[in-house]
Amino acid sequence: MKPTTPTPMKNIRNFSIIAHIDHGKSTLADCLIAECNAISNREMTSQVMDTMDIEKERGITIKAQSVRLNYTLKGEDYVLNLIDTPGHVDFSYEVSRSLCSCEGALLVVDATQGVEAQTIANTYIALDNHLEILPVINKIDLPNANVLEVKQDIEDTIGIDCSSVNEVSAKAKIGIKDLLEKIITTIPAPSGDASAPLKALIYDSWFDNYLGALALVRIMDGNINTEQEILVMGTGKKHGVLGLYYPNPLKKIPTKSLECGEIGIVSLGLKSVTDIAVGDTLTDAKNPTSKPIEGFMPAKPFVFAGIYPIETDRFEDLREALLKLQLNDCALNFEPESSVALGFGFRVGFLGLLHMEVIKERLEREFSLNLIATAPTVVYEVHLTDNSIKYVQNPSELPPENHIACIKEPFVRATIITPSEFLGNLMQLLNNKRGIQEKMEYLNQSRVMLTYSLPSNEIVMDFYDKLKSCTKGYASFDYEPIENREANLVKLDVRVAGDIVDALSIIIDKNKAYEKGRALVEAMKELIPHQLFEVAIQASVGNKIIARETIKSVGKNVTAKCYGGDITRKRKLLEKQKEGKKRMKAIGKVELPQDVFLAILKID
């Protein structure tokens, strides 16, 4: 494709699509791409913006993607830069990042489901960024679509005027041309000073096998060309421009310059994305801007888990694989750790459980690793008796009980929208998870919005699955971190044959310790193979044993070769066996099979 000529700023529109998961966001993006002929019919596939196999299989967007579209309206040529964003709560940092570079957003709502929790959260991010919001009701061709009710829902819940809302069906390609016209007439053109020194915001970066680290930028002021020397303001380092490109899901389109207001890809020939961090500012090395762009928040890990290779000699392979994934995922961080039970591995920080699942699946699939993950935990604020504070993300790091003054755990504010028929089940689940009700609001006769504060620890295990199961999959959920609060927490250890299995230790609410301990030891009794000696499985809090099960020893018939004759001979052999078992019990170690850990992590 030939390099394209610069477009005047008044003819540029930068917009993103925000929606709850499954509301047809990626399908709508495909429609807009097809209508603008950005990709030929031969190359067009469904979910073309979702480039990872795992995205296509799960039907979700994980990585925000951008595409440059050309569209002609009333004889005038326009450039539309579309940024597709993820819909799942774990990837909301991708949403906030993408919205920094836009002037408008399409708020896509399913005509059969109405406004969901994640829709509200993403809309507030867009409003905070002063974006023009264009409501779009999708799936209007479905027999159970209720457009009037959904319009009212958007007005009541979010407060956006829906008198001239766009009604579309991405699948049936209804209303797409009208939507493109509305994007051009409603979303404002970018503002910026084309004559000022270059100021470009890096809002995404990734690693390319041929070009090295690439930065996706929005030109706020000035322009950039291939002859320039660029200063990365965060690192203070200068680099020459190797190439400039317009984004496209299938192939990058080369250009000689990126003008003010445009979105494009910059190649500086760097080896690592850490040299062009997301949120950093690029400027002209010879004529730099006075200060960088501010206010961009980097992503912080929310959930931590140990990840270990099942084949212990593949520790270095796991390190290499994590480093490669980190090149494209600035929210992923890790550090080495070791476990007596599992050997050497890494403590990895994730944005949430789906992020953890996706990373683990990519490590196993793309790097052929067999992995085991420990129970996910959050970061606890531990106040010690000497007035110091320690932050603990691994239960094995928790100091002894007599050194602890108090423990504070992180809380989140959860917003849940549910059909009212499931309200009783849902409130029971939230109470079991130590939730505190803050607000309950009926959106209409059949839907309720609940606001609860919940301990983060309670939502990182199985909350999402239980929420879906108690509401038959109809509830939607979103959360934001709020603060650390004091809690009555203890460390629950599991001992096998007297030894603590460190990989199974968890930090838990004191009132739930007995119930969890009992469930763990009962499950382990079924899972651990019988030994030649008796094995005690115990759950303990501090030095106090709160639950115990015993695996009986396997009997070996030592008198099998004695035929008749003197009973004292048999007795002597049985006594000798008893002595041997006593000695084995004292020094014997129980090897726990890997499937024991896998099964135990699934225990409620």
UniProtKB/Swiss-Prot annotation:
Enzyme class name: hydrolase
**Record keywords:** Cell inner membrane, Cell membrane, GTP-binding, Hydrolase, Membrane, Nucleotide-binding, Protein biosynthesis
Q: List the disulfide bonds.
A: none
Q: Name one Pfam family in it.
A: GTP_EFTU_D2
What is catalyzed by this enzyme?
GTP + H2O = GDP + phosphate + H(+)
Under Enzyme Commission nomenclature, its number is 3.6.5.n1
Origin superkingdom? Bacteria
Q: Which GO terms describe its biological process?
A: positive regulation of translation
User: Which chain positions lie within coiled-coil regions?
Assistant: none
Q: Give the membrane topology.
A: Peripheral membrane protein
Where is it located?
Answer: Cell inner membrane
InterPro entries (alphabetical): EF-4, EFG_III/V, EFG_V-like, EFTu-like_2, G_TR_CS, LepA_C_sf, LepA_CTD, LepA_IV
Q: Where does GTP bind?
A: 22-27, 138-141
Ranges where the tr-type G domain occurs: 10-191
Q: Does the keyword Protein biosynthesis apply?
A: yes
Q: Does the keyword Cell inner membrane apply?
A: yes
| Gene Ontology CC, one term | plasma membrane
Instruction: Provide the function of this protein.
Output: Required for accurate and efficient protein synthesis under certain stress conditions. May act as a fidelity factor of the translation reaction, by catalyzing a one-codon backward translocation of tRNAs on improperly translocated ribosomes. Back-translocation proceeds from a post-translocation (POST) complex to a pre-translocation (PRE) complex, thus giving elongation factor G a second chance to translocate the tRNAs correctly. Binds to ribosomes in a GTP-dependent manner.
Spell out the family assignment given in the record's similarity comment: Belongs to the TRAFAC class translation factor GTPase superfamily. Classic translation factor GTPase family. LepA subfamily.
What is the protein named? Answer: Elongation factor 4
